[in-house]
Amino acid sequence: MMPSSQRPSPRGSRQSPSPDQRGRIAFAILATLVVAVLLLTLFSHAPSGQPLGYSTFIHDVQAKQVRTAVLNNTTGQITGSLTNGTAYSVTGPLPYTSSELSTLSKAHVQVSYITPGPGIASTIIEYVIFFGIFIGIWVYLTRRTQGSVNGIMSVGRSRAKTYTTERPKTTFDDVAGYQGVKGEVKEVVDFLRDPSRFSQLGARIPKGILLVGPPGTGKTLLARAVAGEAGVPFMSVSGSDFMEMFVGVGAARVRDLFQTARRQSPSIIFIDEIDSIGRKRGTGLGGGHDEREQTLNQMLSEMDGFDPAEGIVVMAATNRPDILDPALLRPGRFDRQIVVPLPDLPERLAILQVHTRGKRLAPDVDLEVMAKGTPGMSGADLANLVNEAALNAVRRGATDIAMADFDSARDRIIMGQRREATILSDEEKERVAFHEGGHAVLAYVLDYSDPVHKVTILPTGMALGVTQQLPERDRHLYPREYIEDTLVVRMGGRVAELLVYGDLSTGAANDLQGNTELARRMVREWGMSERLGPMAWGSQNVVFLGEDLLHSAEYSDRTARLVDEEVERILREQEERATELLRQHLPGLIAVAHALLERETISGEEVGRLVDEAAGHPIHPDGKRVLPIAKLPEYAELEQFTVTNGNNHAASHDDTDPVS
């Protein structure tokens, strides 16, 4: 896949030299003239006759062997003839002294003087320098003028890059997993390659395909794979490339892009981050016209307007489909909206296999185990994981990548980089140990919480300590028990400090913030409040101009007060649960805290062993409870929701930093 270049001119046609070539030719001619003049000057001033030393010349004068002497007042050169007729030349000092002239006069030498003006060589040099400077200034100003004119005239031209399939860099084989997504995209590619197979049944090619999904899931990679396999011109452009400081530039670039695509039809246009120009239309902050709207209107007209584009497929990618204009999403423009979700376990394994291809792996590396331990990671996260593992192997001087490198890379991505320079006092380290121990103990004893993977009191990322949990499987639906246990685990650090020290620190700031947001979503969005019942008001997203700026509250002040009361009730109930559980397992909390103070980092298995030994019996003799089948929701069409940030990343409690 290479950027297309200009077509070669017909054989035998003469092409005018480019400005750079003309500049090089002029420089070569000027340099040749300068060298010629210098050589001419050198040879024109070469002395003639037998060269003599100045002392020898004075001796010959005193011996009356010199007949004539011509003195050059400019160069100090003396030429003439001896009494025997031999010509000579000598260079004397300037100015000539009276004693020297008296010596010549006493010897009866015929003396004459010359004061030559500037020679032809000097004149040529002066003219060459003058005209060289003039030509240089003229060329510079000409180029500046042409650049300004070209810049102004080309401001409305599209910045799309056109690719051919002579050397495809990315194919569908490089896109691991996502068989359903690749099937949807391959159908469009097959249509462009062989449209007759579809037109026999009256099928028409989709005009637009919108790739929707979280960041890093491979939407742009799919587009590059289409460019590598389509066999038709593929034009790639970013949504931000349409916008410029001049009014009307965005619409002009849209027109130019589609005109170029029509000339090369059938073709594919890919617009990355289309939400930068496709945002919902509405009144701006000052009531004025938005340049983005003009660009969007031109895009709508080109895709399916009075003069629709035929033989052109528009692909676009975004992770914000909720803010796109409805007119852009209707059938006839973007006929298909393909969701590119976070990869599941088999897809994560396939992605890891693709990114480890060509890398030297140690025998102990098990990619399936690593795929199970990375739920919620996108394809970009997994690529970064493999690269971090390779860098870790290089840092320790190994010749291959071991499983320990992958574990270290995963911890670095989820928990953050360890801060070697941060040194805690003994009192701070002990408080952090009990704080993280509270998280870890509750995560172990609760039935529905995610298992503990690792606990550390080493300053990592922005935190002073981290308790890392890894889900046992990919979750697509979250029961109420899981959400409540998540609230209890987050309360563990705060409650542990209260039980051990009798007071609080700033370490629980992130815990409280996350719990408050989660409890508010339970009440506002998921209908998990008996007092408010089955009502939902949506999340409090960022305000977008022209859409949410003038919206009023969706509920009354009384309802808002009820929401706050229910959020407070949920948080206090889960805090009481956390307090009761930690009082029951206080010996286990002390054992875990002492282990952290001794070794600084312990595994989830060691946390379970310490808690079981302190309790005198296994807390989970048959393993952790899972959600019974009978309690699963009966309606498959229930909308999936997520607990935090819309994804299923491994949880980590990194909230013991006072900065938070």
From Swiss-Prot:
Active site: E436
Annotated binding of ATP, by residue: G213, P214, P215, G216, T217, G218, K219, T220
Cytoplasmic side: 1-24, 140-660
RNA-binding found in the keyword field: no
UniProt cofactor(s): Zn(2+)
GO CC annotations on file: plasma membrane
Classification via CDD domains: RecA-like_FtsH (cd19501)
Protein keywords: ATP-binding, Cell membrane, Hydrolase, Membrane, Metal-binding, Metalloprotease, Nucleotide-binding, Protease, Transmembrane, Transmembrane helix, Zinc
Topological category with respect to the lipid bilayer: Multi-pass membrane protein
NCBIfam families given in the database record: FtsH_fam
Family, per entry: In the central section; belongs to the AAA ATPase family. In the C-terminal section; belongs to the peptidase M41 family.
Protein name: ATP-dependent zinc metalloprotease FtsH
Source organism of the structure: Acidimicrobium ferrooxidans (strain DSM 10331 / JCM 15462 / NBRC 103882 / ICP)
Lineage of source species: Bacteria, Bacillati, Actinomycetota, Acidimicrobiia, Acidimicrobiales
